């Protein structure tokens, strides 16, 4: 997103400087606090903009009386202490409306803003041979979400273990709804921690947020595994990930993919690009979907409420309702090349027109500043 944001700021003639820092810990880094404090004081800045929310930036901006604008594309926000979300200097734009509404109810200045794509950034002049090396029927770029679910459930008694398995199975059958938080009760956590106390010597306790995230990742991981296993039995399937699952013997593992130099070729040369969202995304359109469309790629995605609001499903991208539906829709579009290309082109035209960084930045700095 960084290149797109910078190009958008230039288009709008908004002057800016960039500050790069590699965090060791997003929530505790004295070197960063010292360096960025001096940088802000020397530059006489009125606003700080970051991709995703940084507690340390918020703390500094609160102290110096500077507006802090964050654009979040992650769900959930990966911070342990959420107190800084309520700082008065913050304007936090969330790609996920459901997430924004939840934070708003808890006193956070949370605003819904879908993500964007700069189609020119992804334009690559690749040779025919280079393009051919990325050609495949189906591809997935992302994690397999191999969790420690088995490790953490192993010490639990049969009833508790079965209840957790029931949560994962129930969530796996629901598309367009997020059940996990409602099913994690105080009674469940108390029972789990009582059972852990009987075997753990380090005083370990499972927290609500940790359990919710683990179950969401486990559910997502199972869905991704099933999709890849099913499709790879019939078509060439490529996986771009640092993860590997030896059970997926028919999947071609391609390793890590660079965001700017490889992903545009992956998305444009894959006949079908899968989007299987992490279950913690309540309503929002993941960055992966918008990036694929911005590279003229064809998207086959799970249901997300905002996908249906911002796109014409079946015309600009395709949405599946369950794993069986995913297989049959993949089969259909792999057998109907002209329709597949037509959908991909329409999706590209949609994001090029309606998902620009210029428009999103105008929302940030026009209506809200």
Language-model features: where?
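Short acidic active-site motifs
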Residues: 35, 57, 80-81, 261-262, ...
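Histidine-centered beta-alpha loop that forms part of the nucleotide-sugar donor binding/catalytic region
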Residues: 52-53, 72-76, 97, 115-117, ...
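Catalytic binding pocket for nucleotide-activated donors in carbohydrate/polymer assembly enzymes
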Residues: 1-24, 86, 90, 97, ...
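Active-site proximal beta-strand in glycosyltransferases
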Residues: 61-76, 91-94, 139
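Membrane-proximal helix-turn-helix segments that form the acceptor-binding/catalytic region
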Residues: 76-90
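N-terminal pre-catalytic "stem/leader" segment of glycosyltransferase-like enzymes
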Residues: 1-65, 209-213, 237, 357-369
């Amino acid at each position: 997103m960084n290149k797109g944001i910078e190009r958008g700021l230039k288009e709008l003639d908004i002057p800016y400087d960039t500050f790069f820092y590699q965090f060791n810990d997003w929530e505790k880094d004295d070197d960063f606090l010292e360096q960025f404090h001096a940088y802000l004081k020397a530059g006489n800045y009125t606003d700080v903009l970051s991709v995703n929310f940084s507690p340390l930036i918020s703390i500094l901006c609160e102290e110096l009386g500077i507006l802090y604008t964050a654009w979040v594309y992650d769900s959930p926000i990966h911070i342990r202490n959420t107190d800084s979300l309520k700082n008065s200097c913050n304007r936090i734009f969330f790609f996920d409306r459901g997430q924004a509404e939840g934070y708003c109810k808890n006193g956070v200045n949370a605003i819904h803003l879908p993500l964007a794509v700069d189609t020119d950034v992804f334009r690559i002049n690749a040779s025919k041979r280079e393009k051919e090396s990325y050609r495949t029927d189906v591809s997935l770029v992302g994690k397999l979400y191999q969790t420690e679910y088995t490790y953490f459930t192993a010490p639990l008694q049969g009833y508790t273990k079965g209840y957790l398995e029931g949560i994962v199975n129930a969530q796996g059958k629901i598309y367009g709804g997020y059940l996990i938080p409602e099913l994690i009760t105080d009674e469940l956590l108390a029972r789990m921690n009582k059972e852990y106390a009987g075997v753990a010597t380090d005083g370990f306790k499972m927290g609500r947020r940790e359990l919710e995230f683990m179950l969401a990742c486990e559910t997502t991981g199972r869905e991704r595994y099933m999709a890849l296993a099913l499709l790879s039995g019939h078509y060439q399937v490529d996986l771009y990930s640092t993860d590997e699952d030896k059970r997926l013997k028919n999947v071609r593992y391609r390793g890590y993919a660079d965001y700017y130099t490889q992903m545009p070729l992956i998305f444009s040369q894959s006949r079908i690009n899968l989007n299987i969202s992490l279950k913690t995304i309540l309503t929002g359109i993941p960055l992966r979907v918008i990036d694929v469309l911005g590279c003229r790629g064809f998207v086959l995605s799970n249901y997300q409420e905002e996908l249906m609001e911002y796109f014409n499903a079946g015309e600009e991208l395709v949405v599946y309702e369950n794993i069986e539906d995913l297989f049959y829709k993949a089969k259909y579009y792999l057998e109907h090349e002209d329709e597949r290309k037509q959908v991909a082109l329409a999706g590209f035209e949609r994001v090029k027109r309606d998902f620009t960084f210029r428009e999103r930045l105008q929302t940030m700095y026009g209506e809200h500043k």
